[in-house]
From Swiss-Prot:
Function: Exhibits ester hydrolase activity on the substrate p-nitrophenyl acetate, in vitro. Regulates DNA damage and repair by regulating HIF1A degradation via chaperone-mediated autophagy (CMA).
Binding site for Zn(2+): H266, H268, H278
Nucleus among keywords: yes
Compartments reported by the entry: Nucleus; Cytoplasm
Name of the protein described by the UniProt record: Ester hydrolase C11orf54 homolog
Keyword list, A-Z: Cytoplasm, Hydrolase, Metal-binding, Nucleus, Zinc
Assembly and oligomerization: Monomer.
Matching InterPro entries: C11orf54_DUF1907
Spans traversing the lipid bilayer: none
GO molecular function: hydrolase activity, acting on ester bonds; zinc ion binding
EC number annotated for this UniProt entry: 3.1.-.-
SUPFAM superfamilies per record: AF0104/ALDC/Ptd012-like (SSF117856)
Length: 315
């Protein structure tokens, strides 16, 4: 599998906290950004298979939207244990956003990878979720992957944040009451882009929508048989929902593309009340509350980059 490697700009956590504090204040009424010890992510509401998001951090972008649109390329299937080896971190803890492994499921879905990959001494642990539209009533159907399936697949496209899964220092972000137009992730990403310019910074981690509701989408179970050639066509194909807090989100974002055809931000989420999907923005600016834990990435790995590309379907 072809792979390009890039070293991110890595400011100190303290500097990043200061930059994010300033930028988020333009978009939220109440903002507190600080450097803290990562909370134990094995506990509720996260229930991850590891305690933290620290140690040898990297971002992997695998495949891309051109393998889904305008028409699906069903040859593009991946394995998260193999991806961990490609990014030189066997045993990595991987979280993020991608397309579900249709090669196993038999249909298309939104995928929330949460995987402790295989290493020399440890068996892999799959804490992933997938979301699809319930054919019976049109509602979201969120399922824990390992309750039915035992592989570590994903497909088509994935934006992944990987680490050793260790405890350590992270950036805690609390933001309440949105006053600007940007969603939580876009605000952080654009703040970093404005501050660091041509020095790309990559970040990942997890955040909770503690209060409020969000606009979300779930892809149809059937891939489109007619070509989807614009954002408008894609939006007609997708199923949109409003979903309620608390939601556990898995963001991956990069301040600026270093010329590797990146999807600059991508966030999927799950919950313990049966809702999950692709995060767009909150729909309750007056009441929304976000609490997140983030770590900067040292390296970027661009895996199986599409040779033919386009700019739609990346929202």
């Amino acid at each position: 599998m072809a792979c390009s490697e890039f070293s991110f700009h890595m400011p100190s956590l303290e500097e990043l906290a200061e930059v994010l504090q300033k930028g988020l204040t333009d978009n939220f009424a109440d903002v507190q950004v600080s450097v803290v010890d990562c909370p134990d992510l094995t506990k509720e509401p996260f229930t991850f298979p590891v305690r933290g998001i620290c140690g040898q951090t990297r971002i992997a972008e695998v495949g891309g939207v051109p393998y889904l649109l305008p028409l699906v390329n069903k040859k593009k299937v991946y394995d998260l244990n193999e991806i961990a080896k490609v990014i030189k971190l066997p045993g990595a803890f991987i979280l993020g956003a991608g397309a579900g492994p249709f090669q196993t499921l038999g249909f298309n879905s939104e995928f929330m990878p949460i995987v402790q990959t295989a290493s020399e001494h440890n068996q892999p642990v799959n804490g992933s979720y997938f979301a699809h539209k319930n054919p019976a009533d049109g509602a979201c159907l969120l399922e824990k992957y390992s309750q039915k399936y035992h592989d570590f697949g994903c497909a088509l496209l994935a934006n992944l944040f990987a680490s050793e899964g260790q405890p350590g220092k992270v950036i805690e972000v609390q933001a309440k009451r949105r006053t600007g137009e940007l969603n939580f992730v876009s605000c952080m990403r654009q703040t970093l882009e404005e501050h660091y310019g041509d020095k790309p910074v990559g970040m990942g981690g997890t955040f909770i929508v503690q209060k409020g509701k969000v606009k979300a989408h779930i892809m149809p179970a059937e891939f489109s048989s007619c070509p989807l050639n614009s954002d408008e066509a894609v939006n007609k194909w997708l199923h949109f929902y409003e979903m309620k807090a608390p939601l556990v989100c898995l963001p991956v974002f990069v301040s600026k593309d270093p010329g590797l055809d990146l999807r600059l931000e991508h966030t999927h989420f799950f919950s313990h009340h049966g809702e999950g999907g692709h995060y767009h923005y909150d729909t309750t600016p007056d009441t929304v509350e976000y609490l997140g834990y983030f770590s900067p990435a040292q390296f970027l790995y661009r895996i199986d980059q599409p040779k033919e590309t386009h700019a739609f379907g990346r929202d």
